[in-house]
């Protein structure tokens, strides 16, 4: 009811369904042009084609128990997420965001958080818009133009924007 009452556009919204299982943190992922790895997370990597940043450590939850394993080999400031992690290797004009990006199990344990998913969603939306405007496939757009658009819309496309 909060959304209906306070957020314009939600007046007629309704809950259609909920997940069959709570706490699912990982699902299928694409094989992308680039793959986010635990080394990239741990080493706070920077990428020329970054479209989002994440500053969450690697937290791996036990799928059957309650144990939590934090991987903190050194203090993680934040790391860039490259555009190529959203671009499938073998499909054109498709962008994938959230926990389905091209990432290793360990890297996804950091990147799957909501704030990062929202940043990647914004990047994908602007990339799709740029793709239509430039009459190019999503994988062929200028990532530099995308980064400029993200910055114009108040996003932080990478560490160098901090």
Please report, for each region that a protein language model flagged, where it lies by residue.
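Flavin (FAD/FMN)-binding glycine-rich loop and adjacent Rossmann-like elements that form
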Residues: 1-162
